[in-house]
């Protein structure tokens, strides 16, 4: 594990593989390992993959102040620069997609292409706002209940049913034990306040937006809103829940590789 100092934060990040730079940005409550670790064998032969843990995740440490998207974007960029992989392709998941949007808008000279999975621009939508407020409350009062809620809203019904009782228990228990709950609480506050709409309008990089047809955390309508704002963005959809890269990593990797390795993409 590597570290780079950014403001008051000591940002941890992983480097794997060889080739051009590919930076993966995790989502709320996730980290570089739980969101991306299982995908490394499919990526590291073609890219040098950098996986930062932004504030609130992994072993990254800071003073605990309120999170801002520009500061998290700066942390991700600093990790990429420290790893010497600029320019790079960027992949963001959920809150990480909002961070990627901010980076592509504010650091265009560093970015080649971007992929956004389960993306949203803001939580102005009342359903999304209510959901994140519920997450915030359950982090304080009942983390096991929140873990069950994330399972039910984060995966497709068929995927959950196929796990059986024991499989579902394993997933729930892994959420309870592996999530950095205090850090997630800070990230949820950012989910509630974030708005990268203006940044999205400034993006001029090739962009692939991946929605998820069974997503009940960030419905695919949110991803389609991103497509309407980013000039020239492509849209495709996976038949999964929000946690598509965990539910169906093979299909996610196929989409990722097809876009990032395409000779038709500048």
From Swiss-Prot:
Keywords: Hydrolase, Serine esterase. InterPro entries: AB_hydrolase_1, AB_hydrolase_fold, Meta-cleavage_hydrolase. The keyword Glycosyltransferase does not apply. The active site is at 94 (nucleophile), 215 (charge relay system), 242 (charge relay system). The keyword Protein transport does not apply. PANTHER family: SI:DKEY-122A22.2. Involved in the biosynthetic pathway of pyrrolizwilline, a pyrrolizidine alkaloid. Catalyzes the N-deacetylation of pyrrolizixenacetamide. This is Pyrrolizixenacetamide deacetylase. It comes from Xenorhabdus hominickii.
């Amino acid at each position: 594990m590597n570290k780079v100092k950014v403001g008051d934060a000591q940002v941890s990040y992983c480097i794997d593989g060889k080739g051009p730079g590919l930076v993966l940005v995790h989502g709320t409550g996730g980290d570089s390992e739980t969101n991306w670790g299982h995908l490394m064998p499919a990526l590291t032969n073609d890219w040098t993959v950098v996986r930062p843990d932004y504030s609130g995740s992994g072993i990254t440490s800071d003073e605990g102040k309120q999170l801002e998207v520009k500061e998290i974007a700066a942390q991700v960029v600093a990790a990429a620069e420290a790893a010497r992989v600029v320019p790079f392709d960027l992949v963001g998941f959920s809150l990480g997609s909002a961070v990627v949007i901010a980076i592509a808008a504010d650091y265009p000279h560093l970015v080649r292409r971007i992929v956004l999975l389960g993306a949203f621009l803001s939580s102005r939508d009342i359903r999304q706002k209510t959901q994140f407020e519920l997450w915030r409350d359950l982090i304080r009062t009942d983390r096991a209940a929140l873990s069950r809620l994330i399972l039910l809203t984060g995966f497709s019904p068929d995927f959950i049913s196929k796990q059986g009782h024991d499989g579902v228990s394993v997933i729930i228990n892994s959420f309870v034990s592996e999530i950095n709950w205090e850090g997630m609480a800070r990230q949820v506050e950012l989910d509630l306040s974030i708005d990268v709409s203006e940044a999205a309008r400034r993006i001029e990089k090739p962009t692939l937006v991946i929605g998820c047809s069974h997503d009940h955390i960030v419905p695919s309508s949110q991803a389609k809103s991103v497509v309407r704002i980013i000039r020239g963005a492509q849209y495709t959809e996976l038949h999964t829940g929000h946690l598509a890269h965990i539910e169906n990593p093979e299909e996610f990797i196929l989409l990722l590789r097809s876009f990032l390795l395409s000779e038709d993409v500048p």
